[in-house]
Amino acid sequence: VSGPADAAATTSTLGGATGAADGDAPVLRAAPRDGVLTSIAAATSATAASDDLVGFAASACRAPLAESWLVGGASTTGANDLIELANPGSVPATVQLSVYGSQGVSTPPSGQNIVIAAGERRIVPLAGLLLGEESPVVRVVSSGAPVHAALQTSVTRVLLPGGVEQVAPTAKADTRLVMPGVQVIATAAGQAGTVLRLLAPGADATATVALIPVDAVTPAPASFDIPLTAGLPTSVDLTGNTAGAYTVEVSATAPVVGATWSTTGFGQGADFAWYAAAPEIADPSVVAVAPGSGASVVLAADAGDASVTLTPVEGG
């Protein structure tokens, strides 16, 4: 948890999960100070090490939303993905889950009118919404109260665990997406180690994709255009680029949502990450770094040069 020393943040837990998940979800609250919202942030991480589940996952605390998008995961053989819905408010929420896949958008019965009581959470298996989908995108719409949505995803390849991740939600579709710090690794021929997933939910679009090396030394590959059909997710293999860290930028002619998947490999001990589109930081903000080794902050300027000051926060 990071924030002012006098923020007086309080922590509670949500219960009531149903499905293949155990434990409670923490909720962090901080009251306004002198009529001004308190800047506070929190993050957590977990490491799995069992016969069928191996990997590291980190997640930041986020405010609940009336609408959000989950770009990531799969419902094919070997995938075990769970949609987590949490209602930290004081009144019930009713949630609708719409899934975009290779046949377009659908709202299956198991995704309709999901009631989440105040202070409770629900777990919905992704495979129960749309089975056999390689590149799904889920739209989460809540009425009555905003909810926090996330996607817990893991994969097993022929009995070999391939990693775990907690996919963060995207607040809305936009004509510009920025995904900083995406890792591109060298893989064997025919193995897609870094994949960008895009969806234009409302109208056909053309997306221009640019990869900008974080180290400013690696030559930047040429940008390229991707045609997007409304309502159909599109996956783009980025593996052929020089190994390293990149900022993935997407500019589109219509609002889109997207995220980038990257794996450390396909053998024993492999893990993966989903890089959701990062929110724009226009005002002073607080960032909490989840426990883990080798953590770094990656920033990307939207247009032109920018000067950023990073100041350690007491207790952060």
Give a label for each model feature:
Residues 1, 44-84, 147-201, 256-304:
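Conserved functional hotspot residues at active sites or interaction interfaces
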Residues 1-37, 171-183, 286:
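Extracytoplasmic low-complexity, Pro/Thr/Ser/Ala/Gly-rich segments
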Residues 5-24, 104-137, 217-245, 313-316:
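Intrinsically disordered, low-complexity Pro/Gly/Ser/Thr-rich segments with frequent PxxP/GP/PP motifs
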Residues 18-55, 84, 88-93, 115-162, ...:
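Hydrophobic, ordered structural segments
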Residues 67-76, 89-116, 124, 175-186:
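Intrinsically disordered, low-complexity linker/loop segments enriched in Gly/Pro
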Residues 81, 93, 112, 122, ...:
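Structural beta-strand/beta-sheet cores of well-ordered domains, especially the beta-sheet scaffolds
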Residues 85-107, 142-143, 192-219, 251-252, ...:
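Short acidic, flexible loop segments centered on an aromatic residue
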Residues 168-254:
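Long, internal scaffold/assembly segments composed of regular secondary structure
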